[in-house]
Every structure is written in structure tokens, then in C-alpha cells.
Amino acid sequence: MKVYHTSNSIIVNFDFSKIGSCGGVQVGEGMYFSHSLSLCEGWSVRLGTVTFCVVDIDAKLLDAKRFFAKAPEFIAWLDAYGYRDEEGYLKESVLAEFEASEDAISVLKSRFYKETTNFDGIDDEEFDNIVVWNPKSIKRITQISA
């Protein structure tokens, strides 16, 4: 699917079918999104092969995502799907599906976000990066290419 956005008089043609699950895995193939212009500029120079985009996400969706990730609703959602054990930890069977426990949390948060806020993507709070699969979530994009 191709989507056209304008930002600062720049028309950007995105092929969302090429967006990967995370920037590191899809270097040279996907697109990498961030709120930080300086972060995008720095990494586009370092990697030289990735299209970086500064994204203005619908603020209501993003705020809800960051709040819900730490809220009782997320815990209740985990319990409803049987992801946690009696002590409140993720079950070993759930963790076994992923290479690292951080991956499990990230994927489960993404599933929760999609169900509860209709935001289809990953919000990496540590680095303030966003990987977006649902173009309807995007309000404005500024493209930075190496």
C-alpha cells in the first residue's frame, strides 16, 4: 500500500509493505521512525542505507499507549490471556516463544495497544522510537534519507 503525506512542502511516498518489525532487523529494507529529528539525522549518516522518518503520531493514541503500558488495564489484559503465572511473572511458555524477555514484553505491549487503542506498531519508550504498521496513526512525516 502506498501512502502520500506532506510535511514542510515535502511530498513523501511511503510503501508501507516494506516496513519491518524493527529498524535493526530491516536495515536497508524497511523504514525507521522516531520523534527525534537529531536522532534520525545521526543514524541516517551512520548507517547510510536506511530511510529515517520523523513522525508526528496522533497524540491521543501515543499518550494512551504510554499510560496503559504501566496501568492495571495492561495487567488485566495479560491475565485475561493467561500470560502471567500465580506470582505475577510472565509464564515460561510465553517467554519460550521469544529470544529475550524484553522481546516478549514488547510484542505483548504491541498486541495490547492494537486491541485497546487501535494503534498498530511498537513504541520503544527507552529510545523514543516508533515502528508503525498502521498508516492511519500517522499525522505528519518528515523524511531524512542517507
Segments and roles (model prediction):
Residues 34-36, 41-42:
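Extracellular glycan-interaction surfaces
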Residues 1-26, 44-146:
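Active-site and NAD+-binding cores of ADP-ribose-processing enzymes
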Residues 27-31:
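Short active-site oxyanion
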